[in-house]
Curated annotation (Swiss-Prot):
InterPro entries: M3A_MIP, MetalloPept_cat_dom_sf, Neurolysin/TOP_dom2, Pept_M3A_M3B, Pept_M3A_M3B_dom. It comes from Saccharomyces cerevisiae (strain ATCC 204508 / S288c). This is Mitochondrial intermediate peptidase. The keyword Protease applies. Stimulated by Fe(2+). Its EC number is 3.4.24.59.
Length: 772
């Protein structure tokens, strides 16, 4: 999620004028028509593709009656009439830029009391105008199947991002904001929300070097723009290994007890002396699981986890640009610069948190890896060891899959396999189960809606309206969940349009979707897109189903956690609505949802066999989960290693020796120091995509995981369907978006006042209370 540095605001909205009400009534009539033609169950629209295509007007064999009943209007992406083509996207960007400029001119020249009172509100409207282009383009360039749309999105994103960075260093805007906040006659009439947002904006201006000389501000703009471009290039290439294949001598593989069936599928080089194992597809991974030759496994693993030299250079350039920007802002490191305003306020507290967690986990991790060490020692004819350091020294990352498989061959389990389990979890079952869960704990449900022609970027996209039992429609989720060529491989939650209050002076709603508050005022509906890459399987002629592994169920719950934050975090001002909050707080609602996804009571309610309708047995789930959770601490430690790598790439040593800093050397040295599953062979750091989006804040996943664990045990362990505790979580945390201090939110949810102020003691408390 891209966060706009500046521009956040809001104000008390009043009931619209009569002429404006008429326009809104026309809008809601259209929305009502969509609602009337909503299909039946959620399960059916995700599990029966022919039904979906039929009711959505995509089936050429539709009956005349069906075509009449489901007649569709024509529109653009997300019901924005501009977005029917790449040129339309460019036009929308230009129109938005013009609107932003007009609003800017008004703000700079309105010195009346009214102008001062609405200044923060107008900053937020300005931000919304820019973000509705920037966030939209962020989504399109990651997901849209049309290359022309992707190119247009990149162009528009660059243009708007540069304009935004210019505004972030605009001295006149900052000075007016300071005068508003420092004038008691004005500030006393502002809402608490406006004052909070105004202070955040002022901090963000200062973070952009607003008080520095013009040359420095111009340099800040250039660096920010370059970081954005280099970062996008970096993220676009993280899926690609360094080479398409790796050569393995035939004699090494032929004598490694590998399946002859597998070997026959491999090509050889011209001389016939080497197998050419592709670094894509299943073959290399199958060899990692079955090849007894460690040197072969090592070579394969290294190739699978490496990237090109060009990608390493992109990462190095990104890291150095960030260090230069931080230095320009008089900070010792990019981590210090980035952590301002976060829950963890400085790099030392972050590193202490990670180290505490590592120290609490390393013995458990070594104990989990002990079975691999024993099997490997036996193969190498070495004496067995129980010493932690010796275990960790012996077990390497290319051993994990091979010896895990060998262990289960020697110790066969009666647990069901992943395929058996997945037959109970069709995509439709899981989405329906999520809706039922949200209905019980939050009083909201997911309701399918037919899309207009042109509203989505693929015929496989489903629209879900989010319906509150008290307020009606409160948001929209576009679900792009099925596998598609060229689509991002990483699951993601994209904010397309934030929620915010709509003000009396606003009359044009052609490019947004609008909701109504219980008091009769109006708000911009939050619009988000959930993107996954689930693979349907053909089960009969012309019928396919998408069966989810439990890990994929967890992924979907995680992304829906973000979605609920976006829907329920409805503030007056868009820049603090939903997931527009501190980076080390934003993962908390989504990680909490992972606990629900692992709960047997939830899973037995969702899991229904696709053929018989039989409910999955709790014992079946428990046996399977026990067989797959045996390396939990190892996974936690691996996440901690990545968090420490992120800190290492953004600490003070970069700027002090910038010409000689080597990202791969730094990565491998850290791996050796941290001991667990040491990788001192690959340049995997060049494939760590989160280094761009979560630069200096990747610790957020672990940090929020420890907090989510405490919240789960406090609120939902006894009853995951508790409406009382669901309301408590919604009231004290979700509804605030980024307005309320995150530490205060957590303290209120846990009824733990000592956490309210945050700081080192609170960080230490969270780290020590980690439960794996």
């Amino acid at each position: 999620m891209l966060r706009t540095i500046i521009l956040k605001a809001g104000s008390n909205a009043s009931i619209p004028s009569p002429s404006r009400q008429n326009k809104l009534l026309r809008f809601f009539a259209t929305a009502g028509a969509v609602s009337r033609t909503s299909p039946g169950s959620i399960k059916k629209i995700f599990d029966d593709n022919s039904y979906w295509r039929n009711i959505n007007g995509q089936d050429a064999n539709n009956s005349k009656i069906s075509q009449y009943l489901f007649k569709k209007n024509k529109t653009g992406l997300f019901k924005n009439p501009y977005l029917t083509s790449p040129d339309g996207l460019r036009k929308f960007s230009q129109v938005s830029l013009q609107q932003a400029q007009e609003l800017l001119d008004k703000m700079r020249n309105d010195f009346s009391e009214s102008g001062k009172l609405t200044y923060i509100m107008n900053l937020d409207r300005l931000s919304d105008t820019l973000c509705r282009v920037i966030d939209l383009c962020e989504f399109i360039r990651s997901t849209h199947p049309d290359d022309a749309f992707v190119r247009a999105a990149q162009d528009c994103h660059e243009q708007m991002f540069e304009f935004m960075n210019v505004l972030n260093t605009d001295v006149s805007l900052c000075n007016i904001l300071k005068s508003v906040l420092n004038n008691p006659e004005v500030s006393s009439k502002l809402s608490a929300e406006e004052l909070k947002v105004g202070k955040i904006l002022l901090d963000d201006f200062e973070k952009s070097g607003i008080y520095m000389n013009p040359d420095v501000r111009e340099k800040f703009i250039q660096l920010s723009q370059e970081i954005s471009l280099v970062g996008q290039e970096f993220i676009n290439h993280t899926d690609y290994p360094g080479s398409n294949s790796v050569k393995i001598p035939c004699k090494d593989l032929d004598n490694s007890k590998v399946s002859t069936f597998l070997l026959k599928q491999l090509n050889k080089d011209v001389k016939g002396q080497n197998y050419k194992v592709p670094t894509f597809g299943y073959a290399a991974y199958a060899l990692l699981k079955s090849c007894e030759n460690e040197m072969v496994r090592k070579k394969l693993w290294t190739a699978l986890h490496s990237c090109s030299d060009k990608q390493v250079k992109r990462l190095s350039h990104l890291i150095k640009l960030r260090a230069i920007l931080a230095n320009l802002m008089h900070k010792t490191s990019y981590a210090e610069y980035q952590l301002e305003g976060k829950m963890a306020k400085n790099p030392k507290d972050v590193q202490d948190f990670i180290l505490t967690l590592m120290n609490n986990t390393i013995e458990k991790t070594a104990n989990e890896l002990k079975f691999i060490a024993e099997l490997k020692a036996k193969d190498l004819k070495k004496p067995l060891t129980t010493n932690t350091d010796e275990i960790l020294k012996l077990v390497r990352p290319w051993d994990r899959d091979y010896y895990t498989g060998k262990y289960f061959q020697l110790n066969p389990s009666n647990s069901p396999n992943a395929k058996e389990i997945s037959y109970y979890f069709t995509l439709g079952n899981v989405i329906q189960g999520l809706s039922d869960l949200f209905q019980q704990i939050y009083g909201i449900r997911l309701e399918p809606a037919i899309t207009d022609e042109g509203e989505t970027w693929s015929p496989d996209v489903r629209r879900l309206n989010v319906i509150s039992e008290e307020e009606g429609i409160i948001g929209i989720i576009y679900c792009d969940l099925f596998e598609r060529n060229g689509k991002t491989s990483n699951p993601a939650h994209f904010t397309v349009c934030c929620s915010r209050q709509i003000y009396p002076s606003e009359t044009d709603f052609s490019t947004i979707q609008v909701g109504e508050n219980p008091d009769g005022t109006y708000f911009q509906l939050p619009v988000i897109s959930l993107v996954c890459n689930f693979s349907p399987i053909l089960i009969a002629s012309k019928k396919s189903l998408c069966f989810l592994q439990l890990s994929e169920v967890e992924t979907l719950f995680h992304e829906m956690g973000h979605a609920m934050h976006s829907m329920l975090g409805r503030t007056h001002m868009q820049n603090i609505s939903g997931t527009r909050c501190a980076t080390d707080f934003v993962e908390l609602p989504s990680i909490l949802m992972e606990h629900f996804a692992k709960d047997i009571r939830i899973l037995t309610k969702i899991g229904k066999h696709y053929g018989t309708g039989e409910t999955i047995q709790a014992d079946m789930l428990q046996r399977f989960m026990k067989s797959t959770n045996f390396l939990q601490n190892c996974e936690t430690y691996s996440q901690a290693k990545m968090a420490m790598l992120d800190q290492s790439f953004h600490d003070e040593k970069i700027i002090s020796d910038i010409d000689n800093f080597d990202v791969v050397e730094n990565y491998q040295a850290l791996e050796r120091r941290l001991k667990v599953l040491v990788d001192d062979q690959s340049n995997w750091c060049g494939r760590f995509g989160h280094l761009f989006g979560y630069g200096a804040t990747y610790y957020s996943y672990l940090f929020d995981r420890t907090i989510a664990s405490k919240i789960w045990y406090a609120l939902f362990e006894d009853d995951p369907y508790s409406r009382k505790n669901g309301d408590k979580f919604k009231k004290h945390l979700l509804k605030w978006g980024g307005l309320k201090d995150p530490w205060k939110c957590i303290a209120d949810v846990l009824e733990c006042p000592m956490l309210e102020k945050g700081g080192s003691d609170a960080m230490e408390f969270i780290a020590q209370s980690h439960k794996s």
